[in-house]
UniProtKB/Swiss-Prot annotation:
Gene that produces this protein: grpE
Annotated protein name in UniProt: Protein GrpE
Chief place where the protein resides: cytoplasm
The keyword Glycosyltransferase is annotated on this UniProt entry: no
Example GO biological process: protein folding
Species annotation: Klebsiella pneumoniae (strain 342)
């Protein structure tokens, strides 16, 4: 046996020993490099964090913009709906004096006079047809008596003592009021009953 063969551990060839030692050295090197952080890895991690934050901000901005757009669309639709619903308001306001004049003409007309009967009937029919037309477009008359005073549709002109009507109720309508699609165009001018 040669001296080389004696120094090698149990039947290993010298090349195998060198390869084993070389593997041990390589195994040690990664441990050293794992302790040292590569500045490029740090920069990549930092950039990834910044990217994630920027994406989050962009997502929030997009959601906010979408919500604003939805709100604007909804408001615009409501405004258009209201404009269609109340487009006749100005026209109806112009018609109210005509309707009031026909009402007053009927109040003062001498209905007992047979000579005026055709004229009174003509005024009644004209008033009825005009009210029918405006009702088709959502106009309602406020002229009820013996109902509780509602400041949204009544304007109290005076308070009068009454035994027939409960206190706080409408006793008489001095001038009719009108609503258009539920919105008061003109409040009814009324006298209100008060307790004795």
């Amino acid at each position: 046996m040669s001296s080389k063969e004696q120094k090698t551990p149990e039947g290993q060839a010298p090349e195998e020993i060198i390869t084993e030692q070389h593997d041990d050295v390589e195994a040690v090197e990664p441990e050293v490099s794992a302790e040292q952080v590569d500045p490029r890895d740090e920069k990549i991690a930092n950039l990834e964090a910044q990217l994630a934050e920027a994406q989050k901000r962009e997502r929030e901005v997009m959601l906010r913009a979408k919500a604003d757009e939805d709100n604007l669309r909804r408001r615009t639709e409501q405004d258009i709906e209201k404009a269609h619903k109340f487009a006749l308001e100005k026209f109806v306001n112009e018609l109210l004096p005509v309707i009031d004049s026909l009402d007053r003409a009927l109040e003062v007309a001498d209905k007992a006079n047979p000579d005026l009967a055709p004229m009174v009937e003509g005024i009644e029919l004209t008033l009825k047809s005009m009210l029918d037309v405006v009702r088709k477009f959502g106009v309602e008359v406020i002229a009820d008596t013996n109902v509780p005073l509602d400041p949204n549709v009544h304007q109290a002109i005076a308070m009068v003592e009454s035994e027939d009507v409960a206190a706080g109720n409408v006793l008489a309508v001095m001038q009719k009021g009108y609503t258009l699609n539920g919105r008061t165009i003109r409040a009814a001018m009324v006298t209100v009953a008060k307790a004795k």
